[in-house]
A protein has these predicted regions:
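Hydrophobic alpha-helical transmembrane segments of multi-pass membrane transport proteins
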Residues: 26-34, 38, 66, 85-100, ...
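Juxtamembrane helix-entry segments on the extracytoplasmic side of multipass membrane proteins
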Residues: 17-21, 45-53, 76-81, 142, ...
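Small-residue-rich packing faces within the transmembrane alpha-helices of Major Facilitator Superfamily
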Residues: 33, 57-61, 119, 139, ...
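Glycine-/small-residue-enriched transmembrane alpha-helix faces in small-molecule transporters
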Residues: 1-50, 89, 93-97, 136-143, ...
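Specific alpha-helical transmembrane segments that line the substrate/conduction pathway
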Residues: 50-60, 91, 98-126, 163, ...
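Hydrophobic transmembrane alpha-helices of multi-pass small-molecule transport proteins
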Residues: 63, 116, 129-149, 163, ...
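Membrane-interface interhelical linkers
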Residues: 1-30, 59-86, 127-133, 150-152, ...
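C-terminal-most transmembrane helix of multi-pass membrane proteins
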Residues: 2-8, 56, 254-294
Length: 294
């Protein structure tokens, strides 16, 4: 039995149960944007749609070889199957929109915009002055970010805002998948969703990725992007979501915009301006302040 699923020895806790859920979240936060920063570097060799395809399909292959997740899909009840199908569709479209956005905008800017949706969703589900203030702060931060760069790449912001909407669906569906069926592992359900995403994105991305399949360097880089972007962070997300209350998880999510900025500076040399830094800070405060519905 895998240490992700069961006991590691007689009477002992599974290995993952001995790791604090906060540690999984920190690992997820780092890899969530480290992988895309590598993808930006890969854009010089492979078109955006091709990189998105490489990311998702390589992750799907890892899950297929590691977990054989179709068994969890076939064993699940019909509502859980629909949830996995929906999450797979969101994975495919969200990653494509995200890559189209970061191809032209700084990673930190796209990451900050990403959180407008979850904060708005929190206000819709739990109307309070706290959530209203959180939304106003987030909107103010996003406004500053778009004001700085909108004139240079207006269409890129359309992709960024589409990604924000899809990221909201990801949070809702990923929480549902993590708790969908106690008889199967959440990692297996995640893997099934990733395979579905690979099928969904193939009509759009395969032809763009085809040249990379004959280029060992580009292909290897694509696999690294897939593992660091769609295997490690999503697995860590599932392990954190399963043990953290939604309110606590939402608070930790406030760290992600700052994480994206730091990785953008280190890996991509994307140093934000003073106004952009204020925008990211406002978004982070807004995300930390908001409280999702119970």
């Amino acid at each position: 039995m895998s240490a992700l699923d069961g006991k590691t020895g007689s009477g002992s806790l599974p290995l993952v149960e001995r790791v604090p859920p906060h540690a999984f979240f920190v690992g997820s936060a780092i890899f969530h944007y480290l992988g895309p920063s590598f993808a930006v570097l890969l854009f010089a060799r492979v078109p955006v749609a091709g990189v998105a395809w490489l990311r998702i399909v390589s992750a799907a292959l890892v899950f297929a070889l590691w977990r054989r997740p179709w068994r969890a899909f076939l064993a699940a009840e019909r509502p859980a199957q629909w949830t996995m199908l929906a999450l797979g569709g969101v994975f495919a479209t969200m990653n494509y929109c995200f890559y189209r956005a970061i191809a032209e905008l700084p990673l930190g800017t796209v990451a900050a915009i990403e959180f407008a949706g979850p904060v708005a969703l929190a206000l819709a589900g739990a109307r309070s002055r706290r959530n209203l203030a959180a939304l106003l702060l987030t909107v103010g931060g996003v406004y500053l970010l778009t004001e700085v760069r909108f004139g240079g790449a207006p269409h890129a912001f359309l992709w960024a805002f589409a990604n924000a909407v899809l990221f909201t669906f990801y949070i809702v569906l990923a929480h549902a998948v993590s708790r969908a069926d106690p008889s199967t592992s959440p990692i297996d359900r995640l893997g099934a969703s990733m395979i579905i995403a690979g099928v969904a994105i193939s009509p759009l991305g395969f032809s763009a990725a085809a040249p990379a399949l004959l280029d060992p360097v580009a292909l290897g880089a694509g696999v690294v992007v897939g593992i660091s972007s769609s295997v490690i962070p999503y697995v860590f997300d599932q392990l954190a979501m399963r043990r953290l209350p939604r309110s606590t998880y939402a608070l930790f999510v406030a760290l992600l915009p700052a994480t994206a900025v730091i990785i953008g500076v280190i890996v991509l040399r994307q140093v934000p301006s003073a106004l952009e830094s204020v925008g990211v800070l406002l978004v982070a405060i807004g995300v930390a302040l908001h409280r999702p519905p119970a």
